A protein has these predicted regions:
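RNase H-like nuclease fold core
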Residues: 2-105, 109, 113-121
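Proteins with a high burden of low-complexity, intrinsically disordered sequence enriched in S/T/G/P/A and R
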Residues: 1-10, 175-183
């Protein structure tokens, strides 16, 4: 594969420069596009690792459940300053939040503070179930994790909030016996 550019009379560095220029243009277009026409009901913010790089990613959720990539920022952590900057960029590009948004985040205090302070009173925050499940089970012995994950998932699938809450609260005594930190 590394010999392919030479077959066409191109140097590897020339191909690399052209690739960087083309992708930089597409990235700039993505990061600067207007968000005004998006009718969103939800906003997912999460930090992700890509090799040695860390990114905070923003996805919008439409009324019909479609996820729309909105933007991202390279950052070492999900700290409040970085996340507020990302949210402000989304607002500057036309993110409509005045009708209210559901923000789905992990347990990061930086993300929570950034969302609640940036969208002042127009946001309801929900903890991501996947992150919560992972955090709880990380305190348990390997042999206990799958069973507790299943019980938590079964609770999340209940048809009403009250039923789900009751099932999750019923796990508390069991988790307390396994490891108090899991509660």
């Amino acid at each position: 594969a590394k010999d392919v550019p030479e077959v066409f009379g191109l140097s590897s560095s020339s191909v690399s420069r052209q690739f960087i220029q083309a992708t930089a243009h597409k990235l700039r277009t993505f990061q600067e596009r207007s968000l005004e026409d998006l009718d969103l009901v939800g906003l997912i913010l999460d930090g992700k690792s890509f090799g040695k790089e860390e990114m905070v990613i923003a996805l919008g959720i439409t009324i019909d459940g479609q996820k729309v990539p909105l933007g991202f920022v390279e950052a070492a952590t999900e700290n409040e300053v970085v996340c507020r900057h990302l949210i402000q960029d989304l607002v500057d590009r036309g993110l409509q939040y005045q009708q209210g948004l559901l923000a789905i985040i992990d347990g990061s205090k930086g993300l929570f503070n950034a969302v609640t302070r940036s969208l002042k009173g127009y946001v309801c925050v929900q903890r991501c179930q996947w992150h919560k499940r992972r955090n709880v089970t990380s305190y348990l012995a390997k042999g206990q994790q799958a069973r507790i994950k299943r019980k938590m998932q079964k609770a999340y699938e209940k048809p009403t909030y009250n039923e789900a809450k009751a099932d999750l609260l019923s796990l508390k005594p069991e988790l307390t016996l396994m490891n108090q930190s899991a509660v």
